[in-house]
Design a protein with these regions (language model features):
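Alpha-helical substrate-recognition element adjacent to the catalytic core
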Residues: 2-101
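A short, conserved beta-to-alpha structural element at the edge of catalytic cores
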Residues: 38-46, 148-163
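Short loop-to-alpha-helix "cap/lid" segments that border enzyme active sites
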Residues: 102-115
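Short low-complexity, flexible loop/linker segments enriched in glycine and/or proline
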Residues: 81, 106-107, 156-161
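Acidic, Mg2+-coordinating phosphoryl-transfer loop and its flanking beta/alpha structural elements
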Residues: 111, 118-158
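Glycine-rich phosphate-binding loop signature in dinucleotide/nucleotide-binding domains
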Residues: 5, 61, 114-120
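Generic recognition of short, well-ordered alpha-helical segments
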Residues: 76-80, 106, 136
């Protein structure tokens, strides 16, 4: 049962939704993948204008929640990046450092937990599998299609549970 006295939440992914990760894809193209370097380069991600505009617009009516597959060890860099780009404050849900489940499982679990007490107005994410599962579970989804899709990132999201 959601608490109608609190505003609804709008849930935003980070990588390739708000943050352009194209400059760090090269770390996923080698074998083995260089995850530490991939995440270490995240503070240098340029923001996507489309995503930033949507977060700001959503913040007029909703509480913002950030839902990322980034590991918890990246929290400080992530919070600094959000602040540096003037994004609205909001709770940041991150993957446990040792959690290797697919993004669609971890994110849907958190969405369902949020929905127990709040109206989830929208999920904005670039991962098609996350979006498909969220829609099947009854959530309203906006697919962030403004990033160039990376086959390496897609494989990492699904098979390696790393972003």
């Amino acid at each position: 049962v959601s608490d109608s006295s609190r505003p609804p939440v709008a849930v935003f992914d980070l990588d390739n939704t708000l943050a352009d990760t194209a400059h760090r894809q090269r770390f996923l193209e080698r074998r083995p993948r260089h995850w530490d370097a991939f995440f270490a380069a995240a503070p240098h991600d340029p923001p996507f204008v489309e995503g930033v505009a949507l977060v700001r617009e959503s913040a007029e009516e909703c509480e913002i929640v950030y839902l990322t597959g980034r590991p918890e060890r990246c929290r400080r860099d992530t919070l600094d990046w959000l602040a540096a780009h003037g994004l609205p404050e909001g709770a940041v849900h991150m993957r446990g450092n040792a959690d290797r489940r697919p993004a669609r499982r971890t994110k849907l679990e958190i969405l369902r937990r949020l929905a127990r007490t709040r109206e989830v107005r929208v999920l904005v994410d670039d991962d098609e599998l996350v979006c498909d599962d969220a829609e099947r579970a009854g959530f309203t989804v906006l697919r962030a299609r403004w990033a160039a899709r990376s086959a390496e990132l897609r494989a990492a999201q699904e098979r390696e549970g790393r972003t």
